[in-house]
Amino acid sequence: MKRVLAALLLLCAVTMSAGVAAQTQMNVYFAANAMDEETAGALMERTRQAFPQAQWRAIGPTGERDLRALILGDDMPDLIVCAPSEASLWVSDGLFIALDGCLTDASRISEPVLDACVQDETLFMLPLTAKHRQMAVNRRLLEKRRMGYMANAIEHPIWYPMEFDQLLEEFALADHPALEIWPAEPETCGALEALLQALYGGAWLTEGGETGQADHINVQAALEWLRDRVRGGLIARVGSREEALAHFLNGETALFMDWQTGDERRCARELEKNGIELLTMPYPSSTGFVIRSFELTGVCVAAGANSALAMRAAAFWHEDAQAQRALGERGIWKDDAVWLPEIDATQKGLTLRRLMCEAIESALSGESTPKDALRLVQTTLDAM
């Protein structure tokens, strides 16, 4: 009897061991700044529930272990969550599976978003989320200066530069600038980039996001506009984004130029405590259209033994209702706005951002004209 029992226990142990060994290990790479930790965690948990036959492990860049290092080290993840430009470097090498058949709602998605996910007429990435920046407005401060009519979204869905000037001048007369900007630095210059793109519709990048066009005449006009308002005292300068945000939340300024998805939740206590009636506005633009500077995050499927399961998971993220709730306001859907790609956080993007920041600071300080500063950026980009 003991021998039979021992044999049964051994059989059970072997069976359990085989079951564990049979589970596929699936690695999901999240690039830096691709997705906040809470969202990534919720997405992974939902994936584990939907695909229990695999062990799902989230990995991120640590030290030098970014996507490039993983690929060159023959340690390719199964799913890659990153900006299109980070993944596009490897598309021609055949490292990713074509995902054309996985996208069932392409007609609803903004064309520039889809264009960013296509290379050589192949969809190499499924779009997940797009981050958009906008301005936060203190409605009560506008009403106090008899400019509450500009907070009417029906009559003023967007402000033209001339209207924006009137607002800035009204607050400057009261010695309380409506808007503050901070030093242009690669980590915090996204709002300046978005403002300069929106003012006259000049894009830092071509529509697909692959090529820099920093010396675009409309970018130059926008930088001249910003320089003149700073020199004239209509726009104030502070030391950091955090300082400008604190002034807005304290009710000291009417506008904050870098309001992002999630800021209302993060700042809810201060907004309520200080009685700020918040509304959001797109950046002012002479085009008459809302200009959306967007930063896209998507998912790629690596070619390999696990690609079938990885492809199912990627499609699941794009369609499952609970996955949609985890992703939140995805920001990829088609509307009447003009969409312009924001400079991404890849090495190439960071180079452009550093050059852009140097050009902005040079122009604002009077060290060079906007035209000369931007021409230097473009010359450097062309030489790369």
Language-model-derived ranges and their functions:
Residues 334-384:
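Conserved C-terminal helix/tail region of periplasmic/extracytoplasmic solute-binding proteins
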Residues 50-109, 145-146, 150, 246-247, ...:
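Extracytoplasmic "Venus flytrap"/periplasmic binding protein-like
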Residues 52, 269-331, 358, 365, ...:
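Extracytoplasmic/periplasmic substrate-recognition and gating elements
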Residues 87, 191-195, 199, 220-306:
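Extracytoplasmic/periplasmic substrate-binding proteins
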Residues 82-134, 162, 277-281:
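Hinge/lid segment of periplasmic solute-binding proteins
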